Amino acid sequence: MESASLAAGDVVHFKRGSAFSGNIRISESGTAAKPIRLTSYGKGDLPKFTNPTTRDASGNALILGGDYLIVENLHFHDTPGERVSGMIIMTRLAALRIERGADHCIIRNNEFIKTGQGIMSAGEHTLITENYLDGPSYALWRTSKSSWGPMGIHLNIGNQEVSYNTIKNFGTKDSPWGSDGGAIEIDYGKYHKKNIYIHHNYSEGNAGFIESSWDYDWPPYRQEIHNWRVSFNVCYDGQSWLFMLAPCTGIYFDNNTIARYNGFGRAQNAGARIDVRGGKPIGKASGAHFRNNLFIYSSSPYTGNRSSGALKTANWYSKYKSPGIKYKGDGSQAGSGDPGLVDLEKQDYRLKADSPLRGKAVNLSEFYESDFDGHPLPKTGNWDIGAIQYNAAKPNKALQPKRRSPYL
């Protein structure tokens, strides 16, 4: 692969059942009409890729350095790792890394197992979709007062889309913070953080779903965040669902189902943490807007120094095992109490026919077309609250992938 010369429209086939160790870098570019594609062929387990040491290309098993590249149906595993420097974690560490300037790449239908960071992307107009990521529980680095990671998907820049992925078990349980890591992290202050769309993902057992950093970036530049949509995700994690540190402008969290009643061994178990540290005026959080979300919580649906300033519309709040408690922190809420789900304890978040969430959400059809299960959203009339709209029929197949390979 290192010596192969690729051209637009080429397809590189890796045999199923094969294994590769070390680094591969693709520097050539495809075009919009003729992308270069890396895929698998044959029968059996997906082709396996690893790089066991940061001394070789910072531990990257695959680096994309060109435009219009597609990576699909590959398996990445056991990339570094513990005791990695903060600079490498911020800028280079991942099983699969998209370099700055490598734009219009697609990462789809792959597996990432026990990777300290699964995917890192500094490329714009990237699509990361339908991947299965199952992470480790160790910190990438730690001191007596701090630690960092692991992370499933690490975005270094804006203009990216993360959709229909399954992300599980990225996070520590013994960090000085209580726990650290998470499903998706958006930082590296050198590049802008505009136009990010995160939707229809399933996360479970992570130390949080999304974090946007501020003072903790490397280099220590600060990037405010603009024009994000985080919608129709189902999140059953520990730690905070969100940890928003950067000042927000036009940031929307719509129709998510947030289940925070199992800490997964972690000390913190809050919902949305809005702890904005910068901006003018300092800490203003009115650019964050929560609409049509279902919060199932054991501690609090919101926390942080600016959470009360975030805008809230038509959300529902359910205190775990205390359905009679009305949440008092949202005067515009759709309601509080038992949400009427099919089976909360078995993580079946579909609505029963008599669920009070039905018809209580505002219609956002100008932005969205389908719910978490792929059912079309009504063009007119009120919606249901949460990621899954009521439907009498159980979906035939989940849109978010399950693990295909039994090994490792």
Where does each model-flagged region fall?
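Acidic Gly/Asp/Thr-rich repetitive segments characteristic of extracellular carbohydrate-active
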Residues: 1-21, 25, 355, 373, ...
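Parallel beta-helix/beta-solenoid
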Residues: 7, 15, 28, 33, ...
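Right-handed parallel beta-helix/beta-spiral solenoid domain characteristic of secreted/periplasmic
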Residues: 13-14, 20, 29-90, 335-339
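Residues on the solvent-exposed faces and adjacent turns
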Residues: 16, 28, 40-42, 51, ...
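Predominantly extracellular beta-rich ligand-binding scaffolds that present long acidic/polar faces
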Residues: 22, 27, 57, 200-203, ...
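Extracellular beta-strand/beta-solenoid scaffold signature
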Residues: 25, 51-62, 84-99, 113-120, ...
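C-terminal accessory segments
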Residues: 331-392, 396
